[in-house]
């Protein structure tokens, strides 16, 4: 059985850090899931205002 590679849709991209496919932050070509983004956003220069 051959493995097919998905070429379009929501499951194409994955988190660079953990490989998760849900909750992906793609803005500014970050490609991190929301969990990883919250952990390292401050190190990347993002600030929380409220």
Swiss-Prot record:
The keyword Cell membrane does not apply. GO terms for biological process: cytoplasmic translation. Pfam families: Ribosomal_S14. Its cofactor is Zn(2+). One of its GO terms (molecular function) is rRNA binding. SUPFAM superfamilies: Glucocorticoid receptor-like (DNA-binding domain) (SSF57716). Binds 1 zinc ion per subunit. Zn(2+) binds at residues 15, 18, 33, 36. Gene3D superfamilies: 30s Ribosomal Protein S14, Chain N (4.10.830.10). Disulfide bonds: none annotated. GO terms for cellular component: cytosolic small ribosomal subunit. Keywords: Metal-binding, Ribonucleoprotein, Ribosomal protein, RNA-binding, rRNA-binding, Zinc. PROSITE patterns: RIBOSOMAL_S14. It comes from the Archaea. The keyword Ligase does not apply. Belongs to the universal ribosomal protein uS14 family. Zinc-binding uS14 subfamily. Part of the 30S ribosomal subunit. Binds 16S rRNA, required for the assembly of 30S particles. This is Small ribosomal subunit protein uS14. It comes from Methanosarcina acetivorans (strain ATCC 35395 / DSM 2834 / JCM 12185 / C2A). The gene is rps14.
């Amino acid at each position: 059985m051959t493995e097919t590679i998905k070429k379009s849709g929501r499951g194409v991209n994955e988190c660079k850090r953990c490989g998760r496919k849900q909750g992906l932050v793609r803005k500014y070509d970050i490609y991190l899931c929301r969990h990883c983004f919250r952990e390292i956003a401050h190190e990347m220069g993002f600030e929380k205002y409220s």
